[in-house]
């Protein structure tokens, strides 16, 4: 699981 923090970027 990752949080979207941009266009197609995961944090």
UniProtKB/Swiss-Prot annotation:
Keyword vocabulary terms for this entry = Disulfide bond, Secreted, Toxin
Query: Major place of localization?
Result: secreted
MF terms from GO for this chain are: toxin activity
Compartments annotated for it: namely:
Secreted
The set of disulfide-linked cysteines is 2-11, 5-10
How would you summarize where this protein is expressed among tissues?
Expressed by the venom duct.
What do the Gene Ontology cellular component annotations say? extracellular region
Recorded domain comment = The cysteine framework is XVI (C-C-CC).
Q: What is this protein called?
A: Augerpeptide hheTx1
Organism the protein comes from? Hastula hectica
